[in-house]
């Protein structure tokens, strides 16, 4: 009787540990997926910075006031940079 009880408790403990480990792996995989767009956004930010500053520099060479290039998607050109509004 004691052996059966020990076997049942052991199986229950293994099941709990296995479930916990599976949940941790799933959470880690979701964190990795969430982190991926950040690197893509950084590349977009660099492109916006470059486009905005180049646009202003070209207009300054023509002895005109810098009409800053419009940055789209909640961004605006300020100090030759696209900044988040």
Swiss-Prot record:
GO molecular function, one term: toxin activity
Disulphide bridges, residue numbers: 52-66, 56-77, 71-82
Propiece residues: 23-48
Keyword DNA-binding assigned: no
Tissue spec. comment: Expressed by the venom gland.
Domain of life: Eukaryota
Protein location: Secreted
InterPro entries (UniProt xref): Hwtx-2-like (IPR012625)
Entry annotated with the keyword Calcium: no
Keywords: Disulfide bond, Neurotoxin, Postsynaptic neurotoxin, Secreted, Signal, Toxin
Signal peptide (from-to): 1-22
Principal location class: secreted
GO cellular component: extracellular region; host cell postsynaptic membrane
Family label: Belongs to the neurotoxin 12 (Hwtx-2) family. 02 (Hwtx-2) subfamily.
Function statement: Postsynaptic neurotoxin.
Name this polypeptide is given: U4-theraphotoxin-Hhn1m
Taxonomic source organism: Cyriopagopus hainanus (Chinese bird spider)
